[in-house]
């Protein structure tokens, strides 16, 4: 049967502009681009050179992900929902259209880090980053560097030129214009998330990176239980490869008793080991290649490593590894705990990096919960040593351990619990926001907005705090909870999974500064205002520089802080950090801090 | 390969030069003679394929193929040690031997897990070594420190248990330091952070060190310093590959405990002359020269000094610098350091004719 192509008019009648606008949020950026190239009608409607609605939608899709705890849920009651970066850009760039704001966010933003510099956690070392000047470093008579005391840009891929020296991409014939939509997305950073010992950084292309030599700092996360170990595909491949050569044996293990012949079957044969080994040296070539791929760094920056899912290494023979698998998983959100992190991909699968031995993300399975196609994960949040996610129609799901992976597939069951009565999909009891603390403690608020709930030790209870106004957002760290109302925000300390009522503090900077995001490290806090200003306070331990307020002497001499113990500084009130730009995202790690900053 | 002749005067000078040893595994001082004595005394049955005589075993020791081959014999050797007296005797024969080689201070390693896994208690092993150390102080005026090492190829949980079982020994200061040895590459330092933190929590005075940068790349050294917070690196030869790390080692005076003959025997380098010793000196990275597992690697501390001399020559002033940095990097108290430093000056002054 021959089908006649519908005319533009027919399409316009069946899919009028208001319908198209309604479905835009459900399409990917790529779908929208494809649609715009379909015919004249769509091409005119989805006008990349003029349509502000389209660019606003693209902006939100690219930079306003609501999968992490940085933003509250979008719900019917949050009428004029805006992500933090939207709010900030509208306030700081009034009258600028969304196409320009999109380009600003995409091309003129960069990741800045400061604080403790140990094992490359800032994404650079003292000598690897030319942007690091002597006045940004806290040093002891130039011998020992404790940390970086001012925000410093992380060297990222092709941008050898610091952000301040870069061309504006929308008002000239920059070649970047060409690769605007479907081209290279690796340069554009969507999210940064601070863990105890590292940062996780997500690009617009869906690639996930982690800074430093180790994300876990040698501590175990909410992974396998003590004494259990994941199946390690690459190690197993090495072992089976070595086993195929009878005289060669793998990493030794002392076993047996005194004089047990098992311990050393034939010493004369083992003496010949090296000979056998060398004849077959090339058996390691494929393995070395696989090993290199599995620990890829950012081009030109060895301190930033690509994080990959374990499941892509599901080959018994390294020769069978398909290199294109590397880009088969596209991440859309990342959340970090003390020594672990979670990442969600565009298929709504969840991956966990959660222990000293976990170099690749383990895909988590939640047995007995409904399928993701009907009940997707809407938000992920890492606590100190546990995790909480919100699944549509199921509710809040918490866990702090999982099974080990057993085969080459890299999957494992999470040992989860569903918090009762959190699965409402509408009405007063619908969850508006939640925050994960430690040991499976979760704080959450509902649509009704008047009660703060705490789930801890498997019991839900409500906490009465003298807070004015409706609660709209909560954020937590190991020892601090932040509560946002429609007008202001509060912090309160958490001790042993309980709220210390007498520590409730209203965060007040000046009357005209409105805080829209908070993040906490081990001993410091960072606040982001709706005008893109950043404020820090708390304890800067051991001259680590995590407050970003400059050298200790100048912090003290300016009156902002006081010395505490030998080499620590206490800043009581939130103090503005000098950033020379507009900050659109903040994150506090253990002893370090990070931000995404736009420079016009 | 030797380029410089160890004349009698040089040999005498290097023998008299006060030396500190920081990298010596007591289990690695088990000479074939003592091994066969203990076999007989303890009625241990060796595997049928194991050499039957002292001479045959010496031949094997002279011809290890690689680290694995060495370790196979090393662990069989450990099996003959059963009683407190055995451990005492092992350490005592080491001290007797080096007392004639100008050794003044020794910080010695032992691997409790090689013995506890055979059912011998940590206390028995430690007590035997502790007695020998006390006797070395008394009879030879050799000061000592005892360093308990964790075997990194063992499961981390087991290493944690070892640390826990050593709690009272760490608190009382019988164990002065914590170390980490065995196969490096598959077992990076980050696996042992909690072990180190726990041990340090028992006693703030506990000194920390770890093997790193022998087989592993420089990041193993950096991570050992950052994550395990050690103040010393055992081996660390491969640090030379990272210029930033070299600057850091020099600035923070992190001493590398190098083992020239061991590196050759285990094929880290083909010849002692290939070691970056001159580079370390030029960059002010402190190091000491040590024997590692001398019974197996063909030479105690003096032999290591002589081998290095034969490849590098070096004047009296350079040797004095090495002796001084070995003393400075030791964990003994300032008074002892001062004693040893003045002994260095005396010896240097005594050999007026030596260039």
From Swiss-Prot, chain B:
Substrate binds at residue 293. GO terms for biological process: adenine catabolic process; hypoxanthine salvage; nucleotide metabolic process; purine ribonucleoside monophosphate biosynthetic process. It catalyses: adenine + H2O + H(+) = hypoxanthine + NH4(+). It is found in: Cytoplasm; Nucleus. The record marks 235 as: Important for catalytic activity. It comes from the Eukaryota. This is Adenine deaminase. It comes from Kluyveromyces lactis (strain ATCC 8585 / CBS 2359 / DSM 70799 / NBRC 1267 / NRRL Y-1140 / WM37).
